[in-house]
Amino acid sequence: VGMDFGLKHFLNLDDGSVIDSPQWYKASLNELRTAHRAVSRCQKGSNNRNRAIRNLGRVYQRISNRRRDWFFKLANQLVGEYAIICIEDLNIDGMKRLWGRKISDLAFAEFVSILEWVASNTDTTVVKIDRWAPSSKVCHVCGTINASLSLKQRIWECECCHTTLDRDTNAAINIRRMGLAQLKSA
């Protein structure tokens, strides 16, 4: 299966299905705000401040645990369904500069490491595609490259074969095709 990571949907699979992220950090922002406020209102060095800091740490730990649990469940589901999983090698640091908190909340790198670990315990193969491969801009039907495709265009029509393509599904199909080609050549 080919998988394309995204901001709107966590994963886009090559069959057109999408997997959304629960966005644990975003869901816990009010709780975090309250915990941070409690720390800032306490006097430095006091026992109440130490207690508030421990409480704040627990909130962050709970977010991390929820995200990690969801990643393991998703990785086990994907490994159970597919024998070969093709993903792209993402530039996480570059994405963090552009989208900040959203990328940190999605934690793509953590999911990829969990997916690789779960796959190593089974017969599933994880293939990483080069991050500079034009997965979104290539038509999966005829292979024409759409150089003028911008990030805002979510659906586009191929100039050569006139196929209407969803950007993310098309990228997932191209990732699967490139991953299988990379696997055959190795």
Language-model region placement:
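Positively charged, helix-rich recognition surfaces that bind polyanionic ligands
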Residues: 1-186
